[in-house]
Amino acid sequence: MIKEPEFRDYTPGKLEEKIEQFWKESNIYQKVKELRKNGPKYYFLDGPPYVSGAIHLGTAWNKIIKDMIIRFRTMQGYNVWRQPGYDMHGLPIEVKVEQALGLKTKKEIEEKIGVENFIQKCKEFALNNLRIMTEQFKMLGVWMDWDNPYMTIKNEYIESAWFTLKRAWEKGLLEKDKRVLHWCPRCETALAEHEVRGEYKLRKDPSIYVKFPVEGKENEYLLIWTTTPWTLPANLAVSAHPDYDYVKVRVDLNGREEYWILAKALVEKVLGDIGVKGEVVEEFKGKELEGLRYVHILMDEYPRQKEFREKYEWVHRVILADFVTLEEGTGLVHTAPGHGEEDFEVGQKYGLPVYSPVDDQGKYVEGKWKGVYVKEADPQIIEHLKEKGYLVKAGEIEHKYPHCWRCKTPLIFRATDQWFLKVSKVKEKIIKENDEKVTWYPEWVKIRFDNGVRDSGDWVISRQRYWGIPLPIWQSEDGEIYVVGSWKELVELAVAIEVNGERIDLPESYEEKLKVIEEKLGPEDLHRPYVDAFIIKVNGKEMRRVKDVVDVWFDSGIASWASLGYPRNKELFEKLWPADFIVEGEDQVTKWFYSQQAASVIAFDTVPYRAVAMHGYVLDEKGDKMSKSLGNIIRPEEVVEKAGRDTFRFYMLWATNPWENLKFSWKGVEQVRRMLNILWNVYVLSATYMSLDNFDPRNVKVEELEFREEDKWILSRVNNLIKEVENGIETFYLTKATRALYNFVVEDLSRWYVRLIRKRLWVEGDDPDKLAAYYTLWKVFDVLLRLMAPFTPYITEEIYQNIMRPFTGIESVHMLDWPKPDESAVDEELEREMEFIRRIVEAGSAARQKAKIKLRYPVRKIIIETQDDTVKKAVERLNYILRDQLNAKEVVVGNVEREITVKPNFAKVGPEFKGDARLVAKWISEHGLELYEKGEVDVEIEGKKFHLTREHIIVEENIPDFLVAEDFEGGRVYVDKTLTRELLAEGLAREFVRRIQEMRKRLDLDVNDRIVVTIETTEENRELLQENLEYIMRETRAIEVRFEEAKGYVVEWPEVQAKIGIEKIE
């Protein structure tokens, strides 16, 4: 049976701990899974959060969305695959471990601690953070298989990566190539395009104009501009656009005449920037410059430049390129194929060497600045060029520049040999598969994704690091390669292992090999340096592993099949793949969403997921990014501690559309907490009365109950609510769902329905009208708790356990089915009519306030003036509600006689008609009523024509003095403010009832407790109160009201000139 609530007040902390304990002790999570094990499959793929530290509000938002979707699908009957995942390799962890160990370079890693120890430290760091993050996710009420997460560091996961890369190799989509790529000199590794997107930050760099002497021409120069002076030692050409107009400009430099070649369109800007005047002496097309030779300005400092000049025809010449623009610079571009993507491409076309005199740490390996870090060489190079007379002007520029996504070091462009996935060959396939098979939420993100795919280059997947999936590429001394696809294949091909520099040949038998491997290397571990020890033999050639590891984005890119253990475990893959739904933050559109599709199309020729949703970032209240430096970070634990898990969860799904950025607001959090408090109060009220009357919905004969219009209305609303919430979730328009729930709880259920039925709940005995209200409330909770359970799992569980479980026999709210709307209960017309009734009540209350008549004092009559048929029907059908809520003896539809005065609106007439304003104003004074009735008129006054509208008039209405009016959308409410003795007596009785009830509350009396009331008051009050003594006794549960000295618990109420005493009857 229903009991009185354990907590009278909503205390999230206590309540949620209690529910956590219940779930744990009753093993509810496992029971929920067991219940749905035969349902249709739903593969929810958890995008693995990176284990570099504790979760933040963005991570929490992400997991809350995921948990809500999982709970929703489970209630729909799906057997949801809900394995959490963790991204555990990569640079971010290496950087953290390096900092902890005080290491600064790769050399220090190898010499001070050793690769094996470093990798062990990375593993420990990752596993420790995994444990911390798991507890934080559990704290949010997230239900996933926490005992069985997928981890990118597990052998079977790494083997999935090897399988995928082997598939790429077999398709001709994996190859080694020299390319110019972003390079992090601190981490000493290449970075892929998608790692750099979003990592451009403002920084100041040099901005210099330099002149290259034209060979064989005295005082004639090619004028170039650059922000990377450090790349000038590697300059091999100057690029011009074939179709642009170029000019030779004569300039006067302190009495010395020089000739500069640059783009015609940039002459004024460049000369103005440099601060010199010039005269154009010759004009020509860019293509005419092709082949023009210049003298390298650092030839002596970098002797290799002389070798290149002699060996390559196009070195130190003007070449043609379409990438040259007129937006900045001089129209002539300093070209270094070893340090620029476009430079590299045009260099290939002209047969230029790829020259990059810079090592992995970003230091020069030769020439004048050997051993100097390139960015530190900038000022030295500028000063040197000044001394040599080649510097025209040096300045500074603030621009967006790419930084390492983890260590934040400015990147450099550098040519290196790397391994690439040839995504360029499958781009069109990715776009086609995506457009045909993937549903995007919101839909416009699909276009952004497709454009990203079109703009992407080949995927550089090699990293010159340690903590990552080792590239499964073995290479012979003569350059032949073989890609290993599994642990089994590696063992089969292995002929020897190398341990501490010693070669150990392996026996031929597979089982014997395994024994030796385990004895010498330990159990299978597909990380470095374990796999580095293997020497394999293919085509009669011994091969050793390429030392690189795989881009960490590849780890998560294969998650949809690697998390299922494929290809080691084919059964799960065949049952579940592809994923039905994924959801991640906005930055993942060009990262994880992309890396998955690229890897999947390469491996399986199709996409790995069927539906994808994107959410925004969490910002502070002002819209700023949360950061330590700004001191505006709010931790998830802080929100849970202050407001509770349910409040936090609901707020994050209510505050904004999921694809927009969420500006976190404590006011918003408090607003949601108040909503849940309102829900709790409705529950406490319902459960308290139901428990007193031993209400049992199973014993109710529904067909015998006479439901009132408000009962039918709330049942109609709650059934429509099912559609609204479900539609909001299905379309990922989550705010539609949460705001519909919020409005239903606050406006429909609490502020309206409960307000309408309170008096019915007070009636004693088995009153059928009260029973109808109980049953309606119970049915509303039956639906509402199911709808809210995925959003607020704790409060719904607590309420369910008391008012639902005794009658359903089902152990948890989360084991219930998602509700289906009862169309027979939906009455759209009644809902429309009730909406008007609420508006009329609001307007009527405002009118009473104008008249300064408290709601407790009844009024004689209220008139509703309207032309709307729905309003008329509503007033007729729901008249009893209006009478009760507006405390009126009579509510009727009718018209009120009133006098209308129309005056000119001089604020409008004067400025518009100027000199004719007097004529117009006179006409309005005489004929204004005609204009008011028609809305607009064309008139002729003294031979002049005017167009007049209601904007030109001010309308004053004079209604009878005993009425006060207020408009509502659909009409107007008139309240008759005449107060008779009878009305005064009734109002005073209500005033006293309210105060007695307040005193009962202060004494914490039970609803059923009986009292005796004693009242000391004026003679006039006593006479008025005696007219309504029965009403006072009934409403206050008093067995007697006596007019004498107040006794017991006594309170003086000056505003009604009375002392009231109450005594509980034992």
Curated annotation (Swiss-Prot):
For this UniProt record, the keywords arranged alphabetically read as follows: Aminoacyl-tRNA synthetase, ATP-binding, Cytoplasm, Ligase, Metal-binding, Nucleotide-binding, Protein biosynthesis, Zinc
Q: Name one GO biological process term.
A: isoleucyl-tRNA aminoacylation
The enzyme's main class, written as a single word, is: ligase
The residues the record assigns to binding ATP are K628
Pfam family of the protein (one): DUF5915
Q: Name one GO molecular function term.
A: tRNA binding
Positions occupied by motif 'HIGH' region? 49-59
Span(s) of short sequence motif 'KMSKS' region: 625-629
Q: What is its EC number?
A: 6.1.1.5
Give compartment(s): Cytoplasm
> How does this chain assemble?
Monomer.
Q: What is this protein called?
A: Isoleucine--tRNA ligase
According to its UniProt entry, this protein's organism is Pyrococcus furiosus (strain ATCC 43587 / DSM 3638 / JCM 8422 / Vc1)
Q: What is the lineage of its organism?
A: Archaea, Methanobacteriati, Methanobacteriota, Thermococci, Thermococcales
